[in-house]
């Protein structure tokens, strides 16, 4: 499988994750804790790197984020 990557950003969803987190008035740490309570493995650094687009995001992580924010996965994309 070939991964298409421009060498700069590693995901497209980071800005939307940050926007949704701020709307819910959560810190990165608080968001990570909420996702952990749902049974997903996230930490503050994971959230930071996703938001900064310096980390690839797995399909399971996309599911976790969309579940927590109560949105369709497609809504995470620009």
Predicted segments — roles?
Residues 54, 58-75:
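DNA major-groove recognition helix of helix-turn-helix/homeodomain DNA-binding modules
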Residues 25-49:
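Short alpha-helical DNA-recognition segment
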Residues 78:
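Phosphate-coordinating loops and pocket residues in cytosolic domains that bind phosphorylated ligands
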Residues 1-24:
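A short, Lys/Arg-rich alpha-helix, primarily the initiator
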Residues 15, 26, 42, 57-60:
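Residue-level signal for the short linker/turn that defines the boundary of a DNA-recognition helix
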Residues 22, 33, 67:
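Alpha-helical residues within the helix-turn-helix
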């Amino acid at each position: 499988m070939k991964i298409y990557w421009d060498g700069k950003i590693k995901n497209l969803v980071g800005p939307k994750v940050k926007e949704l987190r701020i709307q819910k008035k959560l810190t990165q740490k608080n968001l990570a804790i909420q996702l952990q309570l749902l049974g997903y493995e996230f930490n503050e650094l994971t959230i930071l790197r996703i938001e900064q687009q310096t980390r690839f995001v797995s399909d399971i992580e996309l599911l976790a984020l969309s579940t927590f924010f109560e949105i369709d996965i497609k809504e995470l994309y620009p």
